[in-house]
A protein has these predicted regions:
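Conserved donor-binding/catalytic core segment of Leloir-type glycosyltransferases
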Residues: 182-193
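Active-site proximal beta-strand in glycosyltransferases
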Residues: 32, 96-99, 109-124
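Membrane-proximal helix-turn-helix segments that form the acceptor-binding/catalytic region
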Residues: 81-85, 109, 123-145, 149-153
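Carbohydrate-associated surface elements
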Residues: 148, 166, 175
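A conserved catalytic-core segment of Leloir-type glycosyltransferases
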Residues: 41-92
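N-terminal subdomain of nucleotide-sugar transferases
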Residues: 1-44
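A short beta-strand/loop micro-motif in the catalytic core of glycosyltransferases
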Residues: 33, 139-146, 161, 192
């Protein structure tokens, strides 16, 4: 059976792939359900961006500061309900959760799962340090993009692997494509897309 990954992305799906997109598109023999922040696709059902990978925009919900406990919990309960409905629709049972930001700690109690990955690619100065500590503690494995992030997270988890940011080198080093016959007789410059 296929492995199931439920990814909480802190960035929307883009034509120029982010770190999270690069990682999720490389999952082999897997189904990936990636949740992006609310945006222009919030009212649409999930969009299949490639075989085995569906992107769903989270619904816009009223955000509340943590000090407003009732509203804060309500915010994450509403997100959890939406995510569980999507899981049911896509037949996800107990996926591996792939978290990319400290705030995702609040979704762990809302979503059934069999394990947690925290992929940390940056510092989060505007999110509570406690959230990140709790997420790192809850994670079965932490991927960190730099040695500094490993040092920062190592008090909370001893299963940390360095996964540096990088470039998809083959994508940028392809040989130039052969000019189609219908364009060979045209003088330059040739503009198009």
């Amino acid at each position: 059976s296929l492995k199931q990954f439920l990814c909480f992305s802190c960035e929307p799906w883009r034509p120029a792939p982010t770190r999270t997109q690069q990682l999720m598109t490389r999952m082999r023999d897997a189904q990936v359900l990636l949740f992006e922040p609310p945006g222009k696709y919030s009212r649409q059902p999930g969009r299949r961006v490639r075989p085995g990978l569906t992107v769903c925009a989270l619904p816009p919900v009223l955000e509340a500061e943590e000090r407003h406990r009732l509203l804060f919990r309500l915010h994450y309960r509403k997100l959890g309900k939406f995510i569980r409905r999507q899981m049911e629709h896509h037949r996800f049972k107990e996926p591996l959760l792939w978290c990319t930001a400290p705030e995702h700690i609040h979704l762990l109690d809302e979503v059934p799962h069999r394990g947690v990955v925290y992929d940390c690619d940056r510092d989060w100065p505007h999110q509570s340090p406690r959230w990140e500590s709790d997420l790192a503690l809850a994670a079965d494995v932490v991927f960190a993009a730099s040695q500094g992030l490993i040092d920062h997270l190592s008090p909370c988890n001893d299963n940390i692997a360095l996964l540096p940011n990088g470039v998809n080198h083959p994508m940028f080093t392809r040989p130039p494509a052969e000019l189609p016959p219908e364009l060979r007789g045209l003088s330059s410059p040739i503009l198009g897309y």
